[in-house]
Amino acid sequence: MFLEKDQDNLDNLETQAKELHKDCKECKNCQKEETKTTNKDNQKEDETVKNQSNQSNQSNQTKQTNTKQQKHQPKENSHLQITKLQTQIKELQQQLTQQKKSFDEELLKNQAELINFKKRAQTQKANELKYASSNFITNLLMPLEQLEKVIDMPTQNELLQKYLLGFKLLQQQIKKVLQDEGVEEIEALNKPFDPALHHALETVCDPKKPDKTNLAVLQKGYLYKKRILRPTLVKVNEWSDKNDKNE
């Protein structure tokens, strides 16, 4: 009885063991299949990740390329703009330099003209002051010459001679004042004719006397501070060898 029970227990145990073993094999196969499936899934995931990574890298590369191109284009545009601005600046500098040169030349010219104008104005003013009495002296000469003619008038009357002597002293005093003021008589009698100092009213032809010589003074001339106040009116001797031969 005990042997049969033991045998039955043993058989049951063996059966259970077989079933367990079978179950174990099935589990291992399942595990293998699961492992394979997992590996496949992992591979797929890896491939997906790789593909995504590649796509991402490609996208990044494309973006980087576009970014580089975009960055490069602004740099080129900026360089062109800078070059253009530098050219414009250089042209403006040249224009400014030329304008400054023209302005400087014009300024120097105007300054020179202003200096010359001031000099002329000062000279004119000085001459006006220097010769301020010219008109007065010119107007005084005529009565002075009339007085001289009266003094030179011959007379036998002693009383009149005394008066004439007094007039002569007065005339000499007036002449002295005029000389002190810079008035001097132009020498003309028997002097070579000078058109700057002499004015010929008459001409004669006398070969015995020097040609172009003043033979007579018709009206006295005067200088006032070395300027001609009035030219001397003269009679001039004019002759030449041709005129002598023709005669």
Curated annotation (Swiss-Prot):
GO terms for molecular function: adenyl-nucleotide exchange factor activity; protein homodimerization activity; protein-folding chaperone binding; unfolded protein binding. Residues 31-49 have a biased composition (Basic and acidic residues). Belongs to the GrpE family. Keywords: Chaperone, Cytoplasm, Stress response. PANTHER family: GRPE PROTEIN, GRPE PROTEIN HOMOLOG, MITOCHONDRIAL. Homodimer. One of its GO terms (cellular component) is cytoplasm. It is found in: Cytoplasm. This is Protein GrpE. Residues 31-79 are annotated as: Disordered.
